[in-house]
Structures are given as structure tokens and as C-alpha cells.
Curated annotation (Swiss-Prot):
Catalyzes the synthesis of GMP from XMP. CDD domains: GATase1_GMP_Synthase, GMP_synthase_C. Its EC number is 6.3.5.2. This is GMP synthase [glutamine-hydrolyzing]. Residues 193-388 form the GMPS ATP-PPase domain. The keyword DNA damage does not apply. The keyword Nucleotide-binding applies. PROSITE patterns: GATASE_TYPE_1, GMPS_ATP_PPASE. The lineage of its organism: Bacteria, Thermotogati, Thermotogota, Thermotogae, Thermotogales. It comes from Thermosipho africanus (strain TCF52B). The gene is guaA.
């Protein structure tokens, strides 16, 4: 299959380039900028896109355009730093901009296949402190903004393009059309990426690989693992065994909902009740990083024991399926090549595959979350399961600030349930990316009836986001928040105050721990 290969130069938006291209029906993959010639050629590239990045081309050890990229003789598009790197490569001049450009700018464009079907002026999103001061020989201007005279360029052959703005972000008008024009008009690539074809290929692939053996799956009830469970069921039926671990850190009635949802889908699941074990291991622990590690290790132990019992019972379990997504693969590749600052330990059960005697199946390892949701819809997963808000692997433990106790879990489950219930009642649930309640480790004075109270505080958090990398706090109606706060204080024993978190990401993370 022909592929649009995106080389990553470090931009926070790089994954969006791949997603935008795929959304238009063309297969794309992401590689680090210093990937080998063989890595790129193995993908059968039809076009190359160079992402943006934080470096300056004149810095020591700055990422550069590898020679072999030019030797491939296929169309190239450089975005932001990618543009500057191309200009530098061909002998042009890049310097610090006299005025940094961050945010909206008006782009004026000339007639060109890259801008076919677009108006002569439109808004784009800039994010750069360097700019091109002189074009290399053989290049010409096809777009300019007030502060970037070379905001869009190409060579005279029309095979190498560069744009100073970011077409991959939603802030750029017609950005997806620009990327599509590059792939279809410039690179002459035919559409080759369709979810129905992918599903059929994966089902056949799983059947061929697994044969008559059995597959176990760690089922959380979230979107990724639920869609994997459904795909495995379509492929191998009862030879797929989903395992659901009840950690005691789930939302109110979540175990019952998961069991009921999969009963309706006709899929049998194995439920392991490990509530007491998780709570016992967490006793007295307040540090969030320590809580995550304990939960991760406990989950591995519980899942391992359950798997060994099933192996003893069935004998022919040979595979472990995981809901690994493309961003997980990308992040692991990045971390292999360079050290990255760790903000939180992620609960992706990292030690599980090494401990279990099974081969790994990851049917979605090259998919993004929105693509998995599309597959779920095609396979018949109910909308309420497809559109569920993200839920952290450690569960409510990272929404209880401080020690996790039975009392805190019950209070938080009830408060969170009220918040989500009201969001759904008021048609707001699908309008926010994620919403939840947080149990705070403080008490406050209050008055109920004629009595003084000294009870717990609940924080509400709701954010709008595209992919969780950045997020804005949701401007929920005041009347709605008032109603939720009243219900929580009146219906949840032990709570006398409710606050609303109005911090965006950055500087805060979405979860409190």
C-alpha cells in the first residue's frame, strides 16, 4: 500500500498531520526525522511530509533533512520547521523573525495545485519565531502573510513545497483541504484507507494467525478494549476470552454495566473480583506516583493469576490481545530515541506481556482513538459505549487526592454519578471531552439546617479537547453547575461543599493526579 510518510521533527501537532491525511482517505504513518532510508522505503512512500518542531535550523545539532529523502524523487511538503529545514538544505537563508508570529494570520495565496478550490485569502495558524529571509535558487513564493513574506513556497518543478503555518490544526481554515491537495493533486495518490476494508483485513488476519487456539484480552470496559473484544468475537467467536478485573476503583455500577453491555452483545466475559486486594495494597499510601505503581503491579499479579487458571482449564490459550493504539507506539519509539520528561507513570500494564507465556496481538497498533470509535460503530457497539469519556487506568484512585479509603470511594462514586447523570440529562455529556468529580483531602465548615457541619469537599472537572494533549476548561452553564452542586450536597453524605476547576491544560493536567 502506498503511504504518506510523516517525519517527526518534534512538533506537538505532528500526530494531527497523520490523522488529517487518514481522515481524507489516504494511509499515513509517522516516523522520527532520523529514521533510516530502509524504514521509510519499507512503507512504500508516495509522499513525504516534514513536521514542525521547536528547533532552529542554525542551532548546533538541529534536526535536518536527510539526503535520501531528496533521492526518493517523490513530493515533499515541509510544515513550519519542515519548511525552514528545506530552505536551509537548498541554500536559502533562515533567520530569527523580527516579530514572532503565534496565533491567527491572514494568508494571501497565488494560483497553485496546493490551494486549488480555496479562496485567495484565509486564516491560518502560525507558531514560529524564525522565518525565511531568502529563498533558495529555483524556488518561488505562492503565499504570504503580514509577517511572513515566504509563508508558502514551492520549487519550480512543483515537487517540493513548504508552508510556514500549520495546516493540520483546526485553527487553520481549509487546512485539511491543503493537505488533501498535496496528497491528491501534487503526489497523485489514490485513496486507499477505509475502515470497512481494515476491519475485513484484520478479521482475516486474526483467523489466519490464531487458527483454533484461544486468545485472552484484558477488558476495561473502555472504548479501546471493548472494540478489540468485539473484533475478536467477529473473528474467532468463543475462542476469545475477555477478562474484566474489578479493582474496586471503578465508577458507580460500572462492573454491572460492563457485564450487562457484553451480555447484550452476546459475549461471555470472565470477571475477577479483586477489590479487597487493591484496597489492602493501597492502605496508607498518599503519593500519586506510588499509588499508580501499586495499582499497576497489583493488576499485573491479578491478571497473571487469572490467566494461569484459564490456561490450566483450556490448555490452548496462545495469545494475549491488547488495545494498544498508534500514539502508544509513537511515544514508545520517541522514548527509545531520546529521554523525555516523565509527568506521570502511564497505566498501560507494561510488565504484563513479559510475564505471560502468550504471543501478543495488537490489532489497533496503527490506529488513532477516533478510528477505533469508527470501527466500533461499524461493528455495532452501542453509542453509549463508543462515546464514553476517557477513564484513567488506575481508576478513582487518582481522583481521590491522598489515601484511598472505602469511605472516599463511596463518596466519590456517588458525587461523580450525579455529575455525569446531570450532564446526560441536559444534553451536555457529548459536548465535553471529559468530565468527572474529584475527592479532595480537606474538610470545610458548613451549615445544614440548624447544625454546623465539618465535611468533605468535592471538585468538579470538565474539559474540552481534541485529543487530550491540550484542553480548555468547559464553560458549563451556571444554572447547571448550581443544580449539580445542590444535588451532591443534599444527596451525598459527608459532603458540604462543591467547587469547579477552571484550569486549562497546560498549565494543569486534566486529571488531578
Amino acid at each position: 500500500m502506498n503511504t504518506v510518510v510523516v517525519l517527526d521533527y518534534g512538533s506537538q501537532y505532528t500526530q494531527l498531520i497523520v490523522r488529517r491525511v487518514r481522515e481524507k482517505g489516504y494511509y499515513a504513518e509517522l516516523l522520527p526525522w532520523d529514521a533510516s532510508k530502509e524504514e521509510v522505503q519499507n512503507l512504500n512512500p508516495a509522499a513525504i511530509i516534514l513536521s514542525g518542531g521547536p528547533a532552529s535550523v542554525f542551532e548546533k545539532d538541529a534536526p535536518f533533512v536527510p539526503d535520501y529523502i531528496l533521492e526518493l524523487n517523490i513530493p515533499i511538503l515541509g510544515i513550519c520547521y519542515g519548511l525552514q529545514s528545506l530552505v536551509h538544505k537548498f541554500g536559502g537563508i533562515v533567520e530569527k523573525s523580527p516579530k514572532r508570529e503565534f496565533g491567527h494570520a491572514v494568508l494571501k495565496v497565488k494560483d497553485d495545485p496546493l490551494f486549488e478550490g480555496l479562496p485567495k485569502e484565509f486564516d491560518v495558524w502560525m507558531s514560529h519565531s524564525d522565518r525565511v529571509e531568502k529563498l533558495p535558487e529555483g524556488f518561488l513564493v505562492i503565499g504570504e502573510s503580514e509577517n511572513s513574506p515566504y509563508a508558502a513556497i514551492r520549487n519550480k518543478d512543483g515537487t517540493i513545497y513548504g508552508v510556514q503555518f500549520h495546516p493540520e490544526v483546526t485553527h487553520t481554515s481549509f487546512g485539511d483541504k491543503i493537505l488533501e491537495n498535496f496528497v491528491s493533486k501534487v503526489a497523485k495518490m489514490e485513496k486507499n484507507w477505509k475502515m470497512t476494508d481494515f476491519i475485513e483485513e484484520k478479521i482475516n488476519e486474526i483467523r489466519k494467525v490464531v487458527g483454533n487456539d484461544k486468545v485472552i484480552l484484558g477488558l476495561s470496559g473502555g472504548v479501546d478494549s471493548s472494540v478489540v473484544a468485539l473484533l475478536l468475537d467477529k473473528a474467532i467467536g468463543k475462542n476469545s476470552i475477555p477478562i474484566f478485573v474489578d479493582t474496586g476503583l471503578l465508577r458507580l455500577n460500572e462492573r454491572q454495566e460492563v457485564e450487562e453491555n457484553f451480555r447484550k452483545l452476546g459475549i461471555d466475559i470472565v470477571v475477577v473480583d479483586a477489590k479487597e486486594r487493591f484496597l489492602s495494597n493501597l492502605k496508607g499510601v498518599e503519593d500519586p506516583e506510588e499509588k499508580r505503581k501499586i495499582i499497576g503491579h497489583t493488576f499485573i499479579d491479578v491478571f497473571y493469576e487469572a490467566s494461569m487458571k484459564l490456561l490450566e482449564k483450556h490448555g490452548n490459550i496462545k495469545y494475549l490481545a491488547q488495545g494498544t493504539l498508534y500514539p502508544d507506539i509513537i511515544e514508545s519509539k520517541v522514548s527509545e530515541r531520546k529521554a523525555a520528561a516523565k509527568i506521570k507513570t502511564h497505566h498501560n500494564v507494561g510488565g504484563l506481556p513479559e510475564k505471560l507465556p502468550f504471543k501478543i496481538i495488537e490489532p489497533f497498533r496503527y490506529l488513532f482513538k477516533d478510528e477505533v470509535r469508527k470501527i466500533g460503530k461499524i461493528l455495532g457497539l452501542p453509542d453509549e459505549m463508543i462515546n464514553r469519556h476517557p477513564f484513567p487506568g488506575p481508576g478513582l484512585a487518582v481522583r481521590i487526592i491522598g489515601e484511598v479509603t472505602n469511605e472516599a470511594i463511596k463518596i466519590l462514586q456517588h458525587a461523580d454519578h450525579i455529575f455525569i447523570e446531570e450532564l446526560k440529562k441536559n444534553d451536555l455529556y457529548d459536548k465535553v471531552w471529559q468530565a468527572f468529580a474529584v475527592f479532595l483531602p480537606i474538610r470545610s465548615v458548613g451549615v445544614m439546617g440548624d447544625y454546623r457541619t465539618y465535611d468533605n469537599v468535592i471538585a468538579l472537572r470538565a474539559v474540552n479537547s481534541f485529543d487530550g494533549m491540550t484542553a480548555d476548561w468547559s464553560k458549563l452553564p451556571h444554572e447547571f453547575l448550581n443544580k449539580v452542586a445542590k444535588r451532591i450536597v443534599n444527596e451525598v453524605d459527608g459532603v458540604n461543599r462543591v467547587v469547579y476547576d477552571i484550569t486549562s491544560k497546560p498549565p494543569a493536567t486534566i486529571e488531578w493526579e
